[in-house]
């Protein structure tokens, strides 16, 4: 069913759809960030967000300070030494349609305040499907290499990268004193096929695809193994450069890389409109099969480095770049069963069990069915022949049914209204404000549901949370069922309890002296986690990695967050403080308050904090006049856009709030400032002009 045109809607109709979309997007955010189990493709998610934004543009009454957050990476393995990226190594946002490309260009122009007639140069280049890597050269000499990791910390793969023939030990010409070159390590189709032949002849497992082969080869503990693998590299970006970049444009930087002897992709071109970008996308897509290496889209980047600096970043991706992904590959197969999985928040997720089929070079035997509404809408039945795709080339999903192949005995699927694990009622929560039912059905078993407890423990120890090496899903399930770990604090008392136990962990099947010692050491190394990781690990509803980072930066310590969360009753100053953190909003504020209001959570935290001491995050900038201060922008700004001003303030270490309160340190007011300016005067908060702000931060 097609959506009703927005210009044909009444305010009441728009409000209903806005509420429904908000609930749906919030549910998708929750499943992506907190449960690591997204149920829609990036393309579908982006379309939902765009529709949501279009409704607010047409009906400004619907807009609120709340923002929806974006995604994240994976923590480095304990098997490698870690390298802290001096400049974060972030990922790109994705688009999947020509309309979204046009929207990207329009957003960039709006953010920069460019008039229609002003030229905007944007590069286009193939998106290599490999493993991102950062190479550091000092005085022209290659000295270090690191994987992306979680974007802030990666794995030290220096010895392995030295074996890649295309990467010079010394750069040609006169490169900067310090140059961090970033790019993609990949494997060609021919090399991949030849390597799999050797694997088969040696009786070893075959690699699924060139990307997996490249990633596995680069992350070998023995560099001699990497040396025997045919890896290649394309340079396309950079991190730290001292004393200054050798060029002022993206094209110029890549040309400089080439002059230094680094391999760059020859298909990179300069475009000046969305139409030219789309034409280049089509051209590269036509060449895709003949390139000899895997690509999964085309990357667009604003060419000017000055404009890139102005555009800055949103969440964990740049505003000045985006990846235009190729359509996901599809296949048909038979759906043999529908299994209901229970997540750590009690969400019941239907998973299709399929006859194995190859999609995009990967064998798929399971696919998401999203939720009960999607099953009903698509009328998916056990025994149906279904169309599946790897959404965004990653997450398999069922697209629909091939009706002319439906068996006569296939019956409509009835979604369970009780938890398949603990038998508790499973309900769809109703939003008290909107009256809209949640798209996800949840088990009400809470603390008595083993599935939820196990999934919460898995999340707590997962890579993007506390990242406890050796304590994976399988181990947690085993330890839970054996009564060894039933709550987070149990992880940190495991070694002490094991010493007193009659049957030692090392004597269990699958364990031994070494693996047990390594596990205990990994646990010990997580007694002082970064505050943002600790907050994320707690599994607070609506608090994914991005919001955990925002809360950590704002409060600085877990005790401060806990104190505010305890006091965050509706209408309180504490609730307002959380709500006013830029990008957080009321939904998260309510979830934080609910979490700390639950006595069982408080008991679990007391037990956990007896063994764990969360550490404050490193400040972005600590030596600026506004570092640590809470600022509010109001009225029209003349030298920069509102988004640009907020991004600048955050880079300088300030906290940007959406409204004025007693905790506001500074209000920057432009022409047309209204209620916020009046509130600042009432509370005695210092108010300055945009010009004074720029002088204060040294940007006048």
From Swiss-Prot:
Task: Note the superkingdom of the native organism.
Answer: Bacteria
SUPFAM superfamilies, per the entry: BRCT domain, DNA ligase/mRNA capping enzyme, catalytic domain, Nucleic acid-binding proteins, RuvA domain 2-like
Record-listed Zn(2+) binding positions:
419, 422, 443, 449
Q: Name one Pfam family in it.
A: DNA_ligase_aden
Its BP terms in the Gene Ontology are:
DNA repair; DNA replication
In which residues is NAD(+) bound?
A: 42-46, 91-92, 125, 148, 184, 301, 325
Its cofactor is: Mg(2+); Mn(2+)
EC top class, as a word: ligase
In terms of InterPro entries, this protein maps to:
BRCT_dom, BRCT_dom_sf, DisA/LigA_HHH, DNA_ligase, DNA_ligase_CS, DNAligase_adenylation, DNAligase_N, NA-bd_OB-fold
Signal peptide feature range: none
Residue ranges constituting the BRCT domain according to the UniProt record: 621-700
**PROSITE patterns attached to this UniProt entry:** BRCT, DNA_LIGASE_N2
Entries under PANTHER family matching the protein: CHROMOSOME TRANSMISSION FIDELITY FACTOR 18, DNA LIGASE
Name-wise, this protein is: DNA ligase
Tell me the classification of the organism that encodes this protein: Bacteria, Pseudomonadati, Pseudomonadota, Alphaproteobacteria, Hyphomicrobiales
């Amino acid at each position: 069913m097609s959506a009703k045109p927005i210009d044909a809607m009444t305010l009441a109709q728009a409000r209903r759809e806005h509420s429904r979309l908000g609930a749906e997007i919030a549910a998708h955010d929750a499943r992506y960030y907190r449960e690591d189990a997204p149920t829609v493709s990036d393309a579908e998610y982006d379309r939902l967000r765009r529709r949501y934004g279009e409704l607010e543009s047409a009906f400004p009454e619907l807009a609120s300070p709340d923002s929806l957050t974006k995604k994240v990476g994976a923590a480095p393995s304990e098997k490698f030494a870690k390298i802290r990226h001096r400049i974060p190594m972030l990922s790109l946002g994705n688009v999947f349609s020509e309309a979204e490309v046009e929207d990207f260009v329009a957003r960039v122009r709006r953010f920069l305040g460019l008039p229609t007639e002003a030229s905007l140069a944007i590069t286009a280049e193939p998106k290599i499907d490999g493993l991102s890597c950062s190479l550091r050269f000092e005085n022209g000499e290659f000295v270090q290499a690191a994987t992306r990791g979680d974007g802030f910390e990666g794995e030290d793969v220096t010895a392995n990268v030295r074996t890649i023939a295309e990467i010079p030990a010394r750069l040609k010409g006169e490169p900067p004193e310090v140059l961090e070159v970033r790019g993609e390590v990949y494997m060609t189709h021919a090399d991949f096929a030849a390597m799999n032949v050797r694997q088969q002849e040696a009786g070893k497992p075959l690699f699924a695809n060139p990307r997996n082969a490249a990633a596995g080869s680069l992350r070998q503990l023995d560099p001699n193994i990497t040396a025997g693998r045919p890896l290649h590299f394309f340079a396309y970006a950079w991190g730290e450069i001292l004393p200054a970049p050798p060029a002022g444009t993206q094209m110029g930087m890549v040309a400089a890389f080439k002059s230094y002897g680094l391999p760059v992709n020859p298909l990179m071109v300069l475009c000046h409109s969305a139409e030219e970008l789309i034409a280049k996308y089509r051209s590269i897509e036509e060449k895709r099969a003949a390139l000899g290496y895997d690509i999964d889209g085309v990357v667009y980047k604003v060419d000017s480095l000055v404009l890139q600096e102005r555009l800055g970043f949103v969440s964990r991706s740049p505003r000045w770049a985006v990846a235009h992904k190729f359509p996901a590959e599809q296949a048909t197969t038979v759906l043999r069963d529908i299994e209901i999985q229970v997540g750590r928040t009690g969400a019941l997720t239907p998973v299709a069990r399929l006859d194995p089929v190859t999609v995009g070079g990967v064998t798929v035997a399971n696919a998401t069915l999203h939720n009960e509404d999607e099953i009903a809408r698509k009328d998916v039945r056990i025994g149906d022949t279904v169309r599946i795709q790897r959404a965004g080339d990653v997450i398999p999903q069922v697209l629909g049914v091939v009706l002319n192949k439906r068996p006569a005995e296939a019956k409509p699927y009835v979604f369970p209204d009780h938890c398949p694990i603990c038998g508790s009622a499973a309900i769809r929560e109703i939003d008290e404000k909107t009256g809209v039912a949640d798209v996800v059905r949840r088990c009400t078993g809470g603390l008595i549901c083993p599935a939820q407890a196990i999934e919460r423990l898995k999340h707590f120890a997962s890579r993007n949370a506390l990242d406890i090496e050796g304590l994976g899903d399988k181990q947690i399930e085993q330890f839970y069922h054996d009564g060894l770990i039933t709550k987070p604090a149990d992880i940190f008392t495991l070694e002490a309890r094991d010493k007193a136990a009659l049957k030692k962990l090392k004597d269990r099947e699958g364990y031994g002296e070494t693996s047990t010692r390594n596990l205990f050491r990994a646990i010990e190394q997580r007694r002082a986690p970064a505050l943002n990781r600790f907050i994320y690990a707690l599994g607070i509803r609506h608090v994914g990695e991005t919001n955990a980072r925002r809360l950590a930066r704002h409060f600085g310590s877990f005790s401060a967050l806990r104190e505010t969360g305890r006091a965050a009753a509706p209408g309180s100053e504490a609730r307002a403080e959380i709500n006013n953190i830029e990008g957080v909003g009321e939904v998260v504020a309510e979830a934080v308050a609910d979490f700390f209001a639950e006595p069982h959570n408080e008991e679990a935290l007391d037990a956990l904090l007896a063994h764990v001491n969360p550490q404050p995050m490193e400040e972005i900038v600590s030596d600026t006049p506004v570092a640590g201060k809470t600022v509010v922008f109001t009225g029209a700004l003349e030298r920069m856009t509102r988004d640009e001003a907020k991004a600048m303030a955050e880079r300088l270490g300030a906290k940007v709030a959406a409204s004025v309160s007693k905790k506001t340190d500074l209000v920057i007011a432009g022409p047309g400032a209204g209620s916020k300016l009046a509130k600042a005067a009432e509370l005695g908060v210092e108010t300055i002009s945009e010009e004074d702000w720029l002088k204060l931060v040294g940007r006048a």
